[in-house]
C-alpha cells in the first residue's frame, strides 16, 4: 500500500531543499498510483514550474482543477504558470477566479 501522504511530504521536503528532480520523481510515482490525488498534482505542478517545464506544470495544474475546480491554491498556481507562459488573458481569468474563491472562503469562515 502506497503511503501517498508521506511520499508527498517527502517530495515537498526535497523541493524545499532544491532537489526538484527528486521531488518530481516521487510525485510522479504517487500520481501513477493515484491519478486524482489533488495534493500530488498541485505539488508536481509547482515543481515543474520551478524546473521551467511550463507546459507540464500547466497540464498537472489543470488536472488538479479537473478533480477540484474550486481549489484556490491550484487556481492561483495556474495564474502564475500562465503569466510565465505569456498568456496574459488566461492569467487574468485565473486571477479573477482566485479572487472570487478567496472571497467565498473568507465569507464561509466569517459565518462559522
Please identify what each model-predicted range represents.
Residues 2-33:
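Alpha-helical segment of the N-proximal tetratricopeptide repeat
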Residues 16-26, 51-63, 85-97:
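Structural signature of tandem alpha-helical TPR/SEL1-like repeats
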Residues 33, 67, 100-105:
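Structural marker of alpha-solenoid helical repeat scaffolds
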Residues 105-112:
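Short acidic DE-rich linear segments
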Amino acid at each position: 500500500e502506497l503511503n501517498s501522504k508521506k511520499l508527498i511530504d517527502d517530495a515537498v521536503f526535497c523541493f524545499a531543499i532544491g532537489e526538484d528532480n527528486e521531488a518530481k520523481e516521487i510525485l510522479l510515482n504517487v500520481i501513477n498510483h493515484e491519478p486524482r490525488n489533488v495534493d500530488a498534482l498541485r505539488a508536481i505542478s509547482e515543481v515543474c514550474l520551478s524546473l521551467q517545464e511550463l507546459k507540464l506544470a500547466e497540464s498537472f495544474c489543470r488536472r488538479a482543477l479537473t478533480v477540484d475546480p474550486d481549489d484556490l491554491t491550484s487556481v492561483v498556481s495556474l495564474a502564475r504558470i500562465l503569466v510565465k507562459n505569456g498568456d496574459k488573458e488566461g492569467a487574468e481569468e485565473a486571477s479573477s477566479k482566485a479572487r472570487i474563491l478567496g472571497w467565498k472562503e473568507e465569507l464561509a469562515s466569517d459565518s462559522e
